[in-house]
Amino acid sequence: MHALARVWARLEEGLIAFLLAAMTLVTFVYVVLNNLYTLLYDLADLWEGGNETLLAIGDGVLTLAQEMTWSNALTKALFAWLIFLGIAYGVRTAGHLGVDVLVKLASRPVQRVLGVIACLACLGYAGLLCVASYDWVKTLFIAGIGAEDLDHFGIRQWHIGLIVPVGFALVFIRFAEILVRILRNRQTGLGLADEAADALKLTEHEEPKA
């Protein structure tokens, strides 16, 4: 079980890294192409000897740039997947911010009770949205509508929307893991990010000024 959890954690991190890299690469290529052809045209005006060659290359680059109208739609789709995978990843790594000042003033048993209540609320929210979004994706699947600017690649709207129920299912699993840890007395709360504690750690590691 622990081995499976480690494999999934690595896969989750790999998917997030891939999505970030793909978004960056697509955007970079699109921006370069849209600026390169103007540079080639300017050089063609300045260099008479290579005028025809530079114009031909510029025309080719311009054609590629015009054909990349799908880049914006793809970037948005990748970003949507990144968001919902990132929500579950944030729950696992305690990356989400929360206000728990009053909770920390309570005794440890009370903190555990409040943690269970908060965890159950999060489970209910994630479960509700998972079921609702599943029905939505099912409707998109039946309709078979192509994704805007991506339909010529065979990408349908339900392909992009599929991450919504999947993402909330992952969030549900992560909060279920937290609930188990709370009930086993291995954790008291949701494990939210603590900016104050992080700032103190950074201060402690700073070298003393001369």
Swiss-Prot record:
Pfam families: DctQ. Disruption phenotype: The dctA-dctPQM double mutant shows no growth on malate and fumarate and residual growth on succinate. GO terms for molecular function: transmembrane transporter activity. It comes from the Bacteria. The chain crosses the membrane at residues 13-33, 77-97, 113-133, 160-180. One of its GO terms (biological process) is C4-dicarboxylate transport. The DctPQM carrier is more efficient than the DctA carrier for the utilization of succinate at micromolar concentrations, whereas DctA is the major transporter at millimolar concentrations. Belongs to the TRAP transporter small permease family. This is C4-dicarboxylate TRAP transporter small permease protein DctQ. The lineage of its organism: Bacteria, Pseudomonadati, Pseudomonadota, Gammaproteobacteria, Pseudomonadales.
